Swiss-Prot record:
Reactions catalysed according to its record: 3-hydroxy-2-methylpropanoate + NAD(+) = 2-methyl-3-oxopropanoate + NADH + H(+)
Name of this protein: Probable 3-hydroxyisobutyrate dehydrogenase-like 3, mitochondrial
Presence of the UniProt keyword Manganese in the record: no
Family recorded in the similarity comment: Belongs to the HIBADH-related family. 3-hydroxyisobutyrate dehydrogenase subfamily.
Gene Ontology MF term list: 3-hydroxyisobutyrate dehydrogenase activity; NAD binding; NADP binding
Enzyme Commission number(s) from the entry: 1.1.1.31
Residue positions binding NAD(+): 35-64, 129, 271
Disulfide cross-links: none
Keyword NAD among UniProt keywords: yes
């Protein structure tokens, strides 16, 4: 992510505001004591991410269909909205990180959605892994309403969310992404990828590479098992060679220990890889089949490292 000095950023804002061709005034400088944050999506990752923002001093309002999920955040100071529209009316910037693109469409573009309540000059930031085309549609509708929209899906799993070290892939207007940096720095590192939809395209590419890497790791471990090797020693032997990777560091020991706690749901990986189908990606298609096998076995809510269970079944290992 690129950062400007405060004086440099102020100059950018003043020059941007002075552009009479812009229908929407550039948003006011972010100030934790004044900028109101709205948040939709308080699952494993979302609750950790918004907790960092609350800890940084921002006033935060959350919306959840199940109010029981909001109790912990309420103890930290979060307020509750009764609908996405009401949340938007109470916010300057609204973040969403939900299950799938249908939820995104409803929450942002629906009759009672975020954009129906956001004040002109407001900003939406969708951090869900979603479709590039939907991100462009949301951006166009936001601009029609004199608001702004950024697509900013993340990578790093629940560990990255807890530690505030997520990778964030941003698409949209570069000045808006820059403007958001005082908030975004609390949850991770932003890389600006380009126009609306570019963040989502980056995330799909990330998932293709990550899933294929994870499947390869799982197959390597199962092969080592079938060969009678000590899989802990196998991991130690190969981790610093060409086969070593962040995926191996994150998931290798968990796979060996059959620890399938969710760091990212397998069913979401199926969704993400499905969005790669518009291009000829045979490796991604094979990976999708294996993760789909997890879901078919009733393991869709397990962590993505559980894909090894499908490979073990194929090899007759219980």
């Amino acid at each position: 992510m690129f950062y400007q000095s405060s004086s440099s950023l102020t100059q950018i804002l003043h020059s941007f505001c002075g552009n009479t061709e812009m229908e929407t005034p550039y948003p006011k400088l972010i100030d934790p004591s004044k900028t109101r944050i709205g948040w939709i999506g308080i699952g494993i990752m979302g609750s950790a991410m918004v907790s960092h923002i609350i800890a940084a001093g921002y006033s935060v309002t959350v919306y959840a269909r199940d109010l029981r999920k909001t109790k912990d955040l309420q103890t930290k100071g979060a307020r509750i909205a009764n609908s996405p529209k009401e949340l938007a009316e109470m916010s300057d910037v609204v973040f969403t990180i939900v299950g799938n693109f249908n939820d995104v469409r409803s929450l942002l573009l629906g009759d009672d959605g975020v954009l129906s309540g956001l004040t002109p000059g407001g900003v939406t930031v969708d951090m869900t892994s979603s479709k590039p085309g939907l991100a462009r549609e949301i951006h166009a509708e936001a601009r029609r309403r004199n608001c702004w929209a950024v697509d900013a899906p993340v990578s790093g799993g629940d560990a990255g969310a807890r530690e505030g070290t997520l990778g964030i892939f941003a698409g949209g207007d570069s000045e808006i992404v820059e403007w958001l940096s005082p908030v975004m720095k609390n949850i991770g590192t932003v890389t600006y990828m380009g126009e609306a939809g570019s963040g989502q395209s980056c995330k799909i590419g990330n998932q293709i590479a990550g899933a294929s890497n994870l499947v390869g790791l799982a197959e390597g471990i199962v092969f080592a098992e079938k060969a009678g090797l000590d899989t802990v020693k196998w991991l130690e032997a190969v981790k610093d060679g060409a086969a070593g990777s962040a995926v191996m560091r994150l998931f290798g020991e968990m796979i060996v220990k059959r620890d399938y706690r969710a760091t990212g749901f397998a069913e979401y990986m199926v969704k993400d890889l499905g969005m790669a189908a518009e291009a000829a990606m045979p490796g991604a298609a094979l990976s999708k089949q294996l993760f789909t096998g997890m879901v078919a076995n009733g393991d869709g809510k397990l962590g993505i490292q559980g894909v090894v269970s499908v490979i073990r079944r194929l090899n007759g290992i219980s």
